[in-house]
């Protein structure tokens, strides 16, 4: 006898998000409506996905990351093993801000910073720029990419750029490794505000999703 056809099932829509648009912090997140994020929450809020943030590190104090960070590491040589101590004297909070935009939890009463995917998990991978690192930058990125893939990342976020179109040879294998494991790599087209006329690596690497 022919096998029975599977019975289709629907995924239940997630419950409502604790969301107070009158909160000054929440009201300042204009992209929640402008980019259709609140509408997207009716379908998914990132549950089951893991986002690796390769940046200066996700700080430990903000309550918006309670139960959000599933793991981490440091590739700079100057951070802590869990990747939760921001690295660098300048813009050390950059990684925390990036993570809050990605998967900040907000507060239970609907106030505070909330991310695009507030039910996703985060991996905090701290790297250093320039003198803030004891390891060459290209080596840090290659190591971080492989660690993220090996530790369950579904998405890798790189909110930084360089001033050259080309990239270190070690990045070829590292980015290919992510591609071969079906990991989406999201990269900033630029990170210098106005005046940037050239899109640099890693945004120029084939296969990445470049956002500008």
Locate predicted features.
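Subtilisin-like peptidase catalytic core
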Residues: 83-163, 212
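Secretory targeting and sorting signals
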Residues: 1-4
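Short glycine-aspartate micro-motif
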Residues: 50-53, 155, 186, 210
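Structural detector of well-ordered beta-strand residues that form the stable sheet scaffold
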Residues: 70, 76, 123, 184-186, ...
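Glycine-centered tight turns that cap/initiate beta-strands
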Residues: 64, 207-210
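Extracellular mucin-like PTS domains
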Residues: 6-12
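Active-site core segment of subtilase-fold serine proteases
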Residues: 13-15, 19-119
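Substrate-binding/access-modulating region of protease and related hydrolase catalytic domains
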Residues: 129-204
